[in-house]
């Protein structure tokens, strides 16, 4: 599953939100969060946060460390 996440993020260099990854790969959202946390600890991924000022929403994008 981690390989699929890496491939998906490699195809989307601007990053993806957790829910987008979950829907695309068809895996349980909470299981995905555990995997993303593991991958961040392993140094494979990092999180980038930003606020969409127009909608006042916080976003967290997952990206590959390169």
Predicted ranges, named:
Residues 2-6:
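Short, leucine-enriched amphipathic alpha-helices that occur as contiguous helical runs
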Residues 9-13:
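Short helix-to-turn junction characteristic of helix-turn-helix DNA-binding domains
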Residues 43:
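Glycine-centered, phosphate/nucleic-acid-interacting loop/turn motifs that mediate DNA/RNA or nucleotide
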Residues 14-24:
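Short acidic, hydrophobic short linear motifs in intrinsically disordered regions
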Residues 21, 34, 51-52:
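Proline- and acidic/polar-enriched loop/turn elements at helix boundaries
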Residues 1, 17, 48-66:
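Short, cationic-aromatic polyanion-contact patches
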């Amino acid at each position: 599953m981690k390989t699929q996440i890496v491939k998906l993020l490699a195809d989307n260099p601007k990053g993806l939100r957790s829910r987008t990854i979950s829907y695309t790969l068809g895996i349980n959202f909470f299981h995905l969060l555990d995997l993303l946390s593991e991958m961040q600890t392993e140094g494979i991924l990092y999180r980038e946060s930003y606020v969409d000022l127009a909608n006042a929403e916080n976003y967290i994008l997952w990206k590959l460390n390169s």
